């Protein structure tokens, strides 16, 4: 009886083991490996391993999975060498990256030495190391050209100039950041730049610290120009006695008869002149800045310069640097008393003082000054003097030049001369040729009124006995035909 039951039990096992073609048995075998626990396996391990096979079971070949490495040129994933195995398998989907990531190191490893465990999770470091150790390519020595990202090291101590304001410099790296916070500590060094070079897709602008928080651009220009311009002292720009200079010292101005300071930031040295020389030196302090409206002062200042120049006095015109404001005043003087245009006057001064460079605001005001001179051209023509190097002008010659306002002065104005046959001639009792049109007449009267107001102010400033001759010459210089016309009924 016992034998019969054992035989039935054996027959039941035989029915299961020796019917491999049964459809039910095929359903239990999972021939396509669809029910394997992939999460339990390593992401880079094979889908099927001999250790996972059931002893005594029939092995069916697994279908070949998708192979990402079968290309003409194998793609290296994150610089990891391909695993040598009988059947290559795809990596886990979480490890797949775009082709562009092959050439870029991760953020946290930009400045570290590349190792076989680069950019791998902590759970897979040991397994990848084992795989790479069994491979002939386990040395993992990649060529430097694959690393396309470079961080720059800048030694700022070579770029920083003493006494010069902080400058900004752009670092042309592919992936750097802005280490502005580190500038609070002081000068950056190479380690500071590398520390902040880990962020992506940013361009670095290093802002070097300033030595003085109150340092401005005028002080920088003054320091530069005082070292490179006017090395031999005041420069003679209009012979024989008109000089251009930057900020002078007290001993520099003691050798001049007239000093015009047109810089607001330069202190007035008039009160420092010794008493025994105060009567000899005439000092004017005009508080101009780089954005001042200088046109309103040009008429008075150019007349003061012209009076002293014609008397042979030694004149010094200066500002802080001697290249912008003071140069503009001398250009205005040349335009008025040498009868030159703005370009010609500027080129004349530029030929002597190579470093002059008025800013555009002053240039535009000189253009306005030239327009004013062209509108008052008959009056200015009588005040035009010859070049000093061609003809030395004395006081008598200046008086005769300013007084002689004959018709010969208008030979360069044929349109005005042709108006002598105008019906308005009968209403003019002056023997001089005068403007005939209402617009010209109104402009002449306005210019004369402005000129007389400036002359009154100038006469008050020159009321001392020592300057009586200057005042007389200045008053005579406006005795022109427009002045005579003002007294007509």
Swiss-Prot record:
Q: Which family does it belong to?
A: Belongs to the protein-tyrosine phosphatase family. Non-receptor class dual specificity subfamily.
Spell out the Low complexity composition-biased ranges. Answer: 419-450
InterPro entries attached to this UniProt entry: Dual-sp_phosphatase_cat-dom, Prot-tyrosine_phosphatase-like, Tyr_Pase_AS, Tyr_Pase_dom, TYR_PHOSPHATASE_DUAL_dom
Q: Which domain of life is it from?
A: Eukaryota
Annotated EC: 3.1.3.48
Give all Phosphoserine modified positions: 22, 98, 151
Q: Phosphothreonine: which positions carry it?
A: 178
Organism, by scientific name, is Saccharomyces cerevisiae (strain ATCC 204508 / S288c)
* Protein name per UniProt: Tyrosine-protein phosphatase MSG5
Q: Which GO terms describe its molecular function?
A: MAP kinase tyrosine phosphatase activity; MAP kinase tyrosine/serine/threonine phosphatase activity; protein tyrosine/serine/threonine phosphatase activity; protein tyrosine/threonine phosphatase activity
